[in-house]
Amino acid sequence: MKTIGLDVGTKTIGVAISDAFGWTAQGLPTIQRSEDDPNRDFEALAQLIKENDVQKVVIGYPKNMNGTVGESATRSETFARTLEQQCNVQTVLWDERLTTAAAQRVLIDADVSRKKRKKAVDKMAAVFILQGYLDRQSHTLT
């Protein structure tokens, strides 16, 4: 069973996918969000879900640092509900606090240029979100 991880932003959606065993997360191409037709975002994800036989989607849940739910987290909740309805897939909201900052730090430490970092950060954040979820799942199973 494969799982997809998403870092949903206002302009892009970072995407990662697990291996068949649910051990590791790998980045996939970032989806550019459509301002004109939000359904295109869900159509792209539906195709990805179908092509990869995905059973579950882990969506980054950007809580505030004090643990409260703000505007961004509410948007993630709405996105998750819509994805469940349109793609008939189970979704999980996963605390994503500091994943983007961690992704930025890794890219800076790897001496990736600012231009390339901008393109890679959403994908890497999605990998961090999904890998965190997978690690927790394997830890609770042992």
From Swiss-Prot:
InterPro entries: RNaseH-like_sf, YqgF, YqgF/RNaseH-like_dom, YqgF/RNaseH-like_dom_sf. Its EC number is 3.1.-.-. GO terms for biological process: rRNA 5'-end processing. GO terms for molecular function: nuclease activity. It comes from the Bacteria. It is found in: Cytoplasm. GO terms for cellular component: cytosol. It is an enzyme of class 3 (hydrolase). Its main location: cytoplasm. Keywords: Cytoplasm, Hydrolase, Nuclease, Ribosome biogenesis. Could be a nuclease involved in processing of the 5'-end of pre-16S rRNA. Belongs to the YqgF nuclease family. This is Putative pre-16S rRNA nuclease. It comes from Shouchella clausii (strain KSM-K16). The lineage of its organism: Bacteria, Bacillati, Bacillota, Bacilli, Bacillales.
